[in-house]
A protein has these predicted regions:
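Generic structural signal for bulky hydrophobic/aromatic residues embedded
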Residues: 57, 76-78, 82, 140, ...
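Extracytoplasmic/secreted proteins, especially bacterial periplasmic and envelope-associated proteins
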Residues: 7, 11, 42, 46-49, ...
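Intrinsically disordered, low-complexity N-terminal segments that are enriched in acidic
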Residues: 1-90
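Secondary-structure boundary elements
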Residues: 106-172
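Intrinsically disordered, low-complexity repeat and linker tracts
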Residues: 1-9, 13, 87-111, 137, ...
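Acidic/histidine-rich, surface-exposed loop or edge segments in extracytoplasmic proteins
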Residues: 23-36, 89-102, 113-124
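Cysteine-centered nucleophilic/redox motifs
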Residues: 137, 167-201
Length: 201
């Protein structure tokens, strides 16, 4: 990332973390004085790089994001104002068709409860070797969830959402399961909480 991109990364990371915890709008605006992009093409290129970095670094915080739809960009040359709108998955969208870019606060609160379960798993293996911790995290995930064969089939009509996220892994409900992406995000999240392991999925 460029120096400006790094600043944008930290700004968006803070906002996205807040949305994950409390819900709210996923429409962001900023001015050229904050992030000096000269053209819309420059903005789009940098935002794509920033978003990819955030998706890799923040598996929990993006549980609400529908990456199959993605984001929308806006660039208003008259006042050098730019906008980034991130699409919310249907399961976490605030009621009303106008809320494509708003996370329901109650659903965000419910999602935040899974953090306690994840932290408890990390605490269980604290002080053990790196190998023991990695194996322990893998085993715990496999005990908590099964592969969601239905969601993996071409004819699945449920849309992109929780089967691809880590929420279903730690929600304590054995009827909610995930596909490969959900397993991977859950494993990375435990490694991130561990603090002593570096994991890139």
């Amino acid at each position: 990332l460029s120096e400006t991109g790094k600043i944008l990364y930290e700004d968006l990371k803070g906002k996205i973390s807040g949305i994950a915890e409390n819900g709210g709008s996923t429409e962001f605006t900023f001015t050229a004085s904050e992030y000096p992009y000269s053209t819309e093409a420059d903005l789009v290129k940098e935002v794509k790089a920033v978003l990819q970095a955030l998706l890799s670094d923040c598996p929990y915080e993006f549980y609400w994001y529908d990456k199959t739809v993605g984001m929308q960009y806006g660039w208003y040359s008259t006042n050098s104002l730019a906008s980034i709108n991130l699409t919310v998955a249907g399961a976490y969208r605030a009621s009303g068709t106008e809320n494509t870019y708003k996370v329901d606060s109650a659903k965000a609160t419910a999602a935040a409860n899974v953090k306690a379960k994840a932290n408890a798993i990390v605490a269980t293996y604290k002080g053990q070797s790196a190998y023991a911790r990695l194996k322990g995290y893998k085993d715990e995930i496999c005990k908590l969830v099964s592969y969601n064969d239905a969601a993996a089939k071409p004819g699945y009509t449920g849309g992109y959402g929780d089967p691809w996220q880590l929420i279903y892994v730690f929600d304590g409900d054995d009827t909610t399961n995930v596909v490969c992406e959900g397993y991977a995000k859950a494993f990375q999240y435990l490694c991130d909480l561990d603090g002593g392991l570096t994991c890139y999925i």
